[in-house]
């Protein structure tokens, strides 16, 4: 087992502190005792669209294995990808770029033990990630140059649209340097990730994530991640190079 995995477990136990730069949200609905009413209806924008804004965090298990909730035959790798996956596991994940303070990439960034902040604007949704101090932009303009002519990047380029109260986001333009999780699930530059965001209440967010990569997987596969609202808090700065104790202790071939 890599030391990095042990460190991640420790961080997972303390990650709520990392986001709790205490700040009372004056817009949040409250119960009689002053606590945030997480069961209240979701907020809406002036145009009536569900507002996804807030600080959110999902289960760290998705960093260890993005397919943690799936059956083994739900994820079918092609022979070359299967060989790469086995090599990474045999090598104890020593070559995982995330262990060298490189970006975790998307969608892996969701599962790392640090929160993310969704900022919903009129024509763009911005997602700020505490880890690596990185971000995503979701563009709603179908003619947006970045989204239509992407250059390969760690996080890809995202285009969004609303279908009722569900936000659908399609992300392409990835490089092939990232791993989907600590287990070493691979992907190629042809990967397309489709998300379906649903916020049924003030304190709940569900995101269906579909991985479609014909160079790596025999069929698309989908995982649903449940996010909890981290109310009355704020992101704080995280600098990986100041916290990275992994490299001198990495094991493997």
Question: Where are the model-predicted features located?
Answer:
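Positively charged n-region of N-terminal signal peptides that target proteins for export
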Residues: 1-5
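PEST-like low-complexity, intrinsically disordered acidic/proline/serine-rich tracts
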Residues: 9-11, 15-253
